[in-house]
């Protein structure tokens, strides 16, 4: 085939230039497969094949691709004929050696947007795959507008365009690149203070941080949201690498000459400020775009609090030439570019709502909204883009300035579960997909029917750093109330900080839940709050807030931190307590979900109850209790704790306990 000869010649040119390209094969399954095999046979390479089906020797499923990160391949096939895992696609593009092709297999071009996408099962909260027309149309726009991407469609004439030769590329040798070396010298001679290094993926910022640690005369501590993500840093730091998780570091009195925070944007600013203040020198690194998260907006906000912060940026890719067509195409397709943060929105702010259909008629607006949200929220992934475009029940508001988007709000429909399902969720018998806050209100709250109410959860909210402190966030929430009808509440779940809670409180939200353990990645407790919109919503918020006040002292003792509520000193078992205790004793409600009422039960009961008292009153560990009580493990300990709760309830009121037991055990049987 003349096409293959031309591709062979172009591949050699790409290798000299240090770039990769995308080649799309769109057509019927057999046609795509046959042409991919012909390419594999014509162009020598590894030909990693990413597909849910076992189509080739060097095969890997999209979900297992993470296990290959850090390795390099020449040429790969990404099979998206039945579903498009956007994160896997982006990750695969980053594993390719310079001079490689990424061959993308797609359905028949004209049929693609109406075809159910199997990947939607991961993010749509739907029981069956759904069509994803907005994402498909967006990707088609990007592919057809990209002069460097090659589109080969079945039953369409194909000719390979002529590509103007680029400058020859000189690959990295393993030593620090000139850009890295210059930055490294500046860091090594930096006076006490804070430095921040930002970079897109593949620019060597983790290697730079590791090289810094290996060369400093003193000691360093590394912290990050996840230790597994610091492997490259550890490799370059060598024996001087020492990792402590953010929450553990905050609780300790460890000292060092340097604190290195990898992917700092993933750590809440209040926690980061506390950590930074304890060390004479700090290096923060963060990704400004990529499939693993983005942090440009966070960094702008953080820099505002440190006016003397030293800012550096790595721009030169390590494993391919700058301006690589494949990297550029992936960035556009998955909206990794968050450069909007560099433009300050001007003029008066106007709040308006829009729905997903705007992706068809005016895609620039939702694109800018997504860029703002992803820049402000570090853990924004390609999966979030797909959800925003095509998942059911998504709603949006924008705060538009004259030239740019100044703020954005993303809301998700929740609740409306049947009475039977809500009761089963409350008892711990069922955990259906989605409904984050609605399910939590039932599973961790006092009302078995809480999930029957209909709410709308704040999934994301962001205001451009240059337009903050102007009330724009509150305007967006007020706009959500104005544009929302026939619902019981707005809800929000967030990592608790005093500053964040003051914002939600000013918006009218009522605190209804506080978690009982810190998230290791953030060092924060999870908080949930409601803004009632109906009488039923108001009753639910009042009931759960009252429960939180009753449990406040118990939670404060357990968490070691006071709650922002007025505690009630009430040791009497209420009707809600009896119901919750029966849910723990005879169903599957978790121990710590029932912390307050269990402690009140222990105050009321005269029985020994060693498994419960040992854990909740004496703070013995599960391992200690298993040894003392001669139990085989945590599961058996929990069984014993449930048995003890049942014994205590029967001792207090046998008839009432039997009635509650019979009622609750029926909740696991429904259609």
From Swiss-Prot:
Residues involved in acetyl-CoA binding: 461-463, 468-474, 499, 506
Entry keyword Heme: no
Keywords, comma-separated and alphabetical: Acyltransferase, ATP-binding, Cytoplasm, Nucleotide-binding, RNA-binding, Transferase, tRNA processing, tRNA-binding
Signal peptide per UniProt: none
Localization, UniProt: Cytoplasm
This protein's GO CC annotations: cytoplasm
Reactions catalysed: cytidine(34) in elongator tRNA(Met) + acetyl-CoA + ATP + H2O = N(4)-acetylcytidine(34) in elongator tRNA(Met) + ADP + phosphate + CoA + H(+)
Binding-site list for ATP: 180, 202-211, 319
BP GO annotations: rRNA acetylation involved in maturation of SSU-rRNA; tRNA acetylation; tRNA wobble cytosine modification
One function term, GO molecular function aspect: 18S rRNA cytidine N-acetyltransferase activity
EC number(s) from the headed UniProt entry: 2.3.1.193
Chief location of this protein within or outside the cell: cytoplasm
Positions of the N-acetyltransferase domain: 356-531
Classification via InterPro entries: Acyl_CoA_acyltransferase (IPR016181), GNAT_dom (IPR000182), NAT10/TcmA_helicase (IPR007807), P-loop_NTPase (IPR027417), TmcA/NAT10/Kre33 (IPR032672), TmcA_C_sf (IPR038321), TmcA_N (IPR013562), TmcA_tRNA_bind (IPR033442)
Role according to the record: Catalyzes the formation of N(4)-acetylcytidine (ac(4)C) at the wobble position of tRNA(Met), by using acetyl-CoA as an acetyl donor and ATP (or GTP).
Similarity remark: Belongs to the RNA cytidine acetyltransferase family. TmcA subfamily.
Protein name: tRNA(Met) cytidine acetyltransferase TmcA
Phylogenetic classification of the source organism: Bacteria, Pseudomonadati, Pseudomonadota, Gammaproteobacteria, Enterobacterales
């Amino acid at each position: 085939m003349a096409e293959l000869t031309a591709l062979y010649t172009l591949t050699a040119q790409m290798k000299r230039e240090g770039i990769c390209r995308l080649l799309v094969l769109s057509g019927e399954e057999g046609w795509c497969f046959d042409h991919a095999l012909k390419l594999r046979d014509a162009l020598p390479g590894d030909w990693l094949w990413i597909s849910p089906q076992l189509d080739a020797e060097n095969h890997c499923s999209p979900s297992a691709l993470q296990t290959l990160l850090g390795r390099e391949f020449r040429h790969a096939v990404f099979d998206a004929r039945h579903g498009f895992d956007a994160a896997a696609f982006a990750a695969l593009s980053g594993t390719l050696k310079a001079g490689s092709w990424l061959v993308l297999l797609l359905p028949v071009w004209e049929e693609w947007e109406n075809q159910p996408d199997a990947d939607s099962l991961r993010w749509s909260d739907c029981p069956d795959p759904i069509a994803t027309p907005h994402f498909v149309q967006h990707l088609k726009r990007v592919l057809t507008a990209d002069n460097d991407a090659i589109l080969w469609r079945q039953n369409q004439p194909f000719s390979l365009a002529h590509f103007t030769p680029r400058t020859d590329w000189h690959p990295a040798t393993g030593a620090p690149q000139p850009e890295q070396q210059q930055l490294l010298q500046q860091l090594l001679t930096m006076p006490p203070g804070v430095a921040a290094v930002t970079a897109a993926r593949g620019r060597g910022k983790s290697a730079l941080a590791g090289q810094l640690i290996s060369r400093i005369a003193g000691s360093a501590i590394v912290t990050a949201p996840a230790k597994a993500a610091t492997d490259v840093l550890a490799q370059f730091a060598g024996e001087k690498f020492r990792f402590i998780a953010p929450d553990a570091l905050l609780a300790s009195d460890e000292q060092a000459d340097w604190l290195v925070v990898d992917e700092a944007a993933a750590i809440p600013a209040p926690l980061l400020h506390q950590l930074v203040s304890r060390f004479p020198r700090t290096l923060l690194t963060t990704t400004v775009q990529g499939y693993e998260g983005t942090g440009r907006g966070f960094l702008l906000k953080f820099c505002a609090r440190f006016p003397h912060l030293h800012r550096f940026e790595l721009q030169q890719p390590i494993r391919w030439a700058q301006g690589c067509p494949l990297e550029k195409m992936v960035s556009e397709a998955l909206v990794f570019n968050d450069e909007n943060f560099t433009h300050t929105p001007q003029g008066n702010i106007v709040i308006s709502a829009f729905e997903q259909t705007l992706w068809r008629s005016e895609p620039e607006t939702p694109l800018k909204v997504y860029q703002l949200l992803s820049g402000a929220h570090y853990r924004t992934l390609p999966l979030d883009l797909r959800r925003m475009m095509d998942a059911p029940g998504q709603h949006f508001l924008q705060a538009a300035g004259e030239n740019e988007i100044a703020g954005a709000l993303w809301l998700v429909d929740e609740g409306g579960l049947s009475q039977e399902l809500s009761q089963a969720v409350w008892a711990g018998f069922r955990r259906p997909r989605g409904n984050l806050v609605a399910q939590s209100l039932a599973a961790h709250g006092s009302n078995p029917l809480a999930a029957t109410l209909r709410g709308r959860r704040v999934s994301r909210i962001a205001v451009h750093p240059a337009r903050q402190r102007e009330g724009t966030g509150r305007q967006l929430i007020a706009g959500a109330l104005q544009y929302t009808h026939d619902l019981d509440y707005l809800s929000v779940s967030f990592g608790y900080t005093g500053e964040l809670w003051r914002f939600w409180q000013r918006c009218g939200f009522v605190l209804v839940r506080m978690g009982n353990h810190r998230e290791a990645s953030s060092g924060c407790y999870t908080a949930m709050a409601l803004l009632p919109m109906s009488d039923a919503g108001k009753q639910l918020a009042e009931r759960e807030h009252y429960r939180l006040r009753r449990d406040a002292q118990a939670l404060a003792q357990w968490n070691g931190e006071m709650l922002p509520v007025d505690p009630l000193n009430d040791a009497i078992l209420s009707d809600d307590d009896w119901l919750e205790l029966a849910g723990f004793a005879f169903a599957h409600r978790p121990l710590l979900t029932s912390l307050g009422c269990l402690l009140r039960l222990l105050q009321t009961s005269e029985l020994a109850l060693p498994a419960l008292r040992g854990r909740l009153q004496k703070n013995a560990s599960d391992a200690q209790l298993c040894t003392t009580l001669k139990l085989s493990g945590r599961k058996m300990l929990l069984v014993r704790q449930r048995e003890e709760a049942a014994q205590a309830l029967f001792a207090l009121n046998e008839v009432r306990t039997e009635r509650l037991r019979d009622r609750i055990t029926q909740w696991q049987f429904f259609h």
